[in-house]
Amino acid sequence: MLVRLHVVIDKEDEDMEKRVKDKLSFLCAKFSYSPSREQPSLNGCIEWYATADLSDQEINDLLDVLNNDWDGDHYDCDAYGFNTKMFDENVYYLQFQTI
């Protein structure tokens, strides 16, 4: 199943972006990443997308480690870092979708 993960981190910092992408790649080596860009509605934040072709079990395992409290349906959900536990302290927002 093809999945897309939208990632927003809380600082425009290339080293931080690399660290977060490295963590994501460790959790899911199948991810490919779009170029990052400044997040238009959040001052000082950057965003990018990660895509992969994953099995149902891989999706379940990944969702369990990315965040502890997703909102929404299993295959279309999101989470904010200010009120949940993210896989990295600088992740502000995640949206996970099957496409």
Functional labels for PLM-detected ranges:
Residues 1-25:
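Short, extreme N-terminal segment that most often corresponds to the first beta-strand
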Residues 2, 41-43:
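Short Gly/Ser/Thr- and Asp/Glu-enriched loop/turn motifs at secondary-structure junctions
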Residues 21-32, 43-99:
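Charged interaction segments
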Residues 36-38:
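N-terminal/domain-start alpha-helical segments
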